Amino acid sequence: MHEHNVPMRRAIVTIALILACSPAPDVPTATTQASSAHAAHGAASRINNGELTAEQKQAVADVRKATQRFHDIAFATAANGGGYTMQFPAGCAASPDGAQGFHYLNNGLVDANVELLRPELVMYEPGPNGQMNLVGVDYIVPLALSATPPTLLGVPFAPLGPPLNVWALHIWAWRPNPSGMFAPWNPKVSCEFAQ
């Protein structure tokens, strides 16, 4: 990341968060976000681990290698460590289809570009003893920066409407997902121990 881009990226995130308070006519609302928007992933997001292409398998292995150090949430959330310093959105995300856990955002990575080895968010499942277990990564692009869905590894991002207003794609690099490697929700992840 170029140091002179930091203020611009922060400004973009601030604008995206402000826009999150405004209705977006062609984007699902927060109440339909869990069902409609995530359904937009289509068949591509339901690819199970055994059905991944050779390129996708290698990419997941590369993501695991790049994010291995984030198993230590203290390092991941330190400003001088991983830089994933804020929750976005706040709280443990769950739905009838499974959960995603807590999302930690690296604000400096949010822009119109998607970099496989530099995900904008890392996701953690809360454990019974207060520990946080790394389960996957999430890539986002503010809707305001891309009129069409970005793609990664041949999989289109899904639009998430207010209050988030982003395109999103999950990779369950650290927790097997029977719904698929790129599915939005993972039934093997739980918010049961969220505090």
Question: Where does each model-flagged region fall?
Answer:
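N-terminal secretory signal peptides that target proteins for export/translocation
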Residues: 1-8
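N-terminal secretory leader/proregion of peptide precursors and effectors
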Residues: 29-33
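Primary mode marks residue(s) on the alpha4-beta5-alpha5 output face of response regulator receiver
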Residues: 37-195
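Bacterial signal peptide processing site
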Residues: 22-25
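Sec-dependent signal peptide recognition
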Residues: 9-14
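C-terminal motif of bacterial Sec signal peptides marking the signal peptidase cleavage site
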Residues: 18-20
